[in-house]
Amino acid sequence: MEIINNKKVAVSTSEELKNALENDNGYEFIYLMDNITLDSGIKINENKEKVVIDGTYNGNRYTLTGMSSTDAVDTIVAVSTNKEIIVRNINISYENTYGVIYVPLDLNYIGLLTVYDNINFNGTRLAYNPYGNVKIIDSNIVIEETNGIASLEICVGNYVIIGGKTTITSSSTNSCLFYFRNNLTPSIVFLCQSDVSLSTNTREFMTGTNKLNFTILHDTKVHIITANGLGPNPVYGTNNVLIDERATLIFIQKSHQRVPVWSTYGNFTMKKDSNLELINSYENTPADNYNIHFKGSNCKFILDNPNSVVMYSKNASVLYTNNTLEYKIKCKRINLWNNSKTLTSAGDINDLPEYSWYKDDDLLEINGNIDATTTTITSHNLTEEELNKLPDLNNFIFQSKKQFSLGNNIINVHPIDNSKNKISGHTTDMADVLIKYNNTIEIVKADDDGYFEYNITDAITDNTKIELTSNVASSFIYGSRTITSPYDGELSLIDAVKTFTFSKVPISLDPMIFGKNESISLKIVDSRVNSSEWKVYAYIKNPLTSQGGYTLKNALVFKKLDNEVVILNESPTLIFTGTNNDGNAKMTLITWSKEKGPLLDLTNSALEANEEYF
């Protein structure tokens, strides 16, 4: 044992680890300085409110191996006076099914936090903390049979937090990924700006509750693959679901059982620019294996301007409720299909939705109610002119729909008249573009800049209606434009970065300026016949503010390409001027490096500790 100071110690044997944790010695940080295999259970001293077990010492990372036992007392055991137990920077091999830290099934342990940070774990179960909180950060977790001991869940917990770059896989045939008890209010939260992947090819996501609050915080991607969906029987499900701004959930069911892919008893809410893919990829799924079954009596389905939503099933309705479900949809475009192709050929340019509704220059808003047999619309913002060219709203029916999507592909159509020998434009990179006019139907491919063209032999006469539809294969997302020749082109923002983060390392000390972690770009296409200068402005709706209400005034600045620096506020500020296109359609890619564009100026402000600003 190497004593570092009165709070830190390094250990090299199981006995030394036991002494450091069990005795009232003041040690809060215990470092491994060798690989250790436990040869007895350890009960953490009651006077240690917080303890950290760190597997890295002097630049070397070590492995903790558990005992060959499945008894709760043969692991590291918490007591009720412990508050926070952190295991970090370590490799772990464990066969004990009570996890690395065993927290007893006792209401006295409510709120006890066990943290697994930057660990590589192979074993039967990572965490057992049924009434407490479990946090998993920046880790690789493999749940598998170990030394003949069958594997169970990743963890048993009440409030589970997952974040950072975390990958979790399970080959357990006995247990779901998570177990939550139903006598509290269980939750799972995916932290902001995280990238999390979870998979089981044999079981479901969770079991034990129909009250799970499921939250993905902003700018986070969560990819979940299961054999049989959310839960193993029709009772288990979520309470409220939140997919926050710019967050993404991909949830795939590969097999089936006679329960919905996802059952929910509360509200299902998606915020601005969020994304959802809810896919049942099993082709022979039964008709009652709905993608989402809203089971609560007061559920709401709130889609508040998400970037994209895709739900797919070969045979079952993607949405079902046997109660009255209120829906509120704000989006760029809605697509509904009566029938479904096989997944490998669905959602492409040859699988156009039977029904699509959208507005050309605004967001579509449509609200109403759904029950087991009827979809009703209580309000919408489509004009009479728009309704005349779109499907009848009597076809806006969720019942028996096998495919459903929200989202839009932008299309900039270049000028067309009787002197042109092509139809061209810009859209999403590598999209397929369906072009229809008169008796002509053609599909062309956009290049990696989004440019497409179709060469024609006969001139297009005036007053010809031309329909264009853009789709990236298998995306289920479409964009549509209908124009009449002659057409004089347009100015379009094709693509823009939606989020970025600031570096923690300043690029200037006086003033104290922080750059971005990566460059940002705008893609603008000007195809106007009568082109002129165009301008890009920047402004902020509110100053940077933390969850706790702390504000950074005048902290957001913009460094233009000519190095002029301006403070951003509620008033739009000119940041770029584009030139006219000289008579030819032109794409302009504006890129601001890490050291230009939006920057963070903390010369006259200070960040509060443990606060996130947005």
Residues of each region from the PLM?
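Extracellular/surface-exposed low-complexity segments
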Residues: 1-19, 274, 278, 296-299, ...
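Short glycine/acidic-rich loop motifs that flank beta-strands on beta-rich extracellular proteins
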Residues: 40-42, 67-70, 95-103, 121-131, ...
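Short beta-strand/loop motifs in extracellular/secreted proteins, especially
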Residues: 28, 429-433, 464, 520, ...
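Glycine-rich repeat segments that build the extracellular carbohydrate-interaction surface of secreted
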Residues: 9-12, 23-39, 50-58
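Signature of Gram-negative chaperone-usher
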Residues: 486-614
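Extracellular beta-strand-rich solenoid/capping regions of secreted or surface-exposed proteins
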Residues: 37-53, 63-89, 93-110
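All-beta strand scaffolds that present successive hydrophobic residues in beta-strands
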Residues: 52-55, 82-89, 107-117, 134-138, ...
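Ser/Thr-rich low-complexity repeats and stalk/linker segments
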Residues: 405-486
